Amino acid sequence: MPTLFLFGASEGGLFDFDATLPLMAVQVVLLTFILNALFFKPVGRVVEEREDYVNTSRAEAKKKIAEVELLETELKDQLKEARLEAQKVILEAEQDSENLYKEALALATSEANASREKARREIDSQRDEALNQLKSEADNLGDLIIERLLAKK
């Protein structure tokens, strides 16, 4: 049976140094160039393009992150300024309210004092008038009593 395998082979078998070995070497080199041209270069190009895309995407992302951070700090500053301005407006409104309250209280107090003073003057006037009337009636009554007493004598 071993002779059956060697039927087509010559004396040296597979390791004969005839034209087969250089032909195989040429086939390997040719296959390498073909694979390089058809497979490795396109795949390498796709990998490089993908790497460039990833690098540019990463650079754009870093740039956008920097822009977002800048906008965030600007917005925080604006928010802080708005809060300070709102506090200032609230404080001014409180002061205005306090001033209006004090003015209204002073006006009400002065009006109450004026009204009380007017009422006191009216009462004094009416009292003086009543006293004068009482005095004149007392004088009249005294005169009447004197006249009656003198008339009886």
From Swiss-Prot:
One of its GO terms (molecular function) is proton-transporting ATP synthase activity, rotational mechanism. Belongs to the ATPase B chain family. Keywords: ATP synthesis, CF(0), Hydrogen ion transport, Ion transport, Membrane, Thylakoid, Transmembrane, Transmembrane helix, Transport. F-type ATPases have 2 components, F(1) - the catalytic core - and F(0) - the membrane proton channel. F(1) has five subunits: alpha(3), beta(3), gamma(1), delta(1), epsilon(1). F(0) has four main subunits: a(1), b(1), b'(1) and c(10-14). The alpha and beta chains form an alternating ring which encloses part of the gamma chain. F(1) is attached to F(0) by a central stalk formed by the gamma and epsilon chains, while a peripheral stalk is formed by the delta, b and b' chains. SUPFAM superfamilies: F1F0 ATP synthase subunit B, membrane domain (SSF81573). F(1)F(0) ATP synthase produces ATP from ADP in the presence of a proton or sodium gradient. F-type ATPases consist of two structural domains, F(1) containing the extramembraneous catalytic core and F(0) containing the membrane proton channel, linked together by a central stalk and a peripheral stalk. During catalysis, ATP synthesis in the catalytic domain of F(1) is coupled via a rotary mechanism of the central stalk subunits to proton translocation. Component of the F(0) channel, it forms part of the peripheral stalk, linking F(1) to F(0). The b'-subunit is a diverged and duplicated form of b found in plants and photosynthetic bacteria. The gene is atpF2. It holds the Pfam family ATP-synt_B. It is a single-pass membrane protein. InterPro entries: ATP_synth_b, ATP_synth_B-like_membr_sf, ATP_synth_b/b'su_bac/chlpt, ATP_synthase_B_chain. The keyword Transport applies. GO terms for cellular component: plasma membrane-derived thylakoid membrane; proton-transporting ATP synthase complex. Gene3D superfamilies: F1F0 ATP synthase subunit B, membrane domain. It is found in: Cellular thylakoid membrane. This is ATP synthase subunit b'.
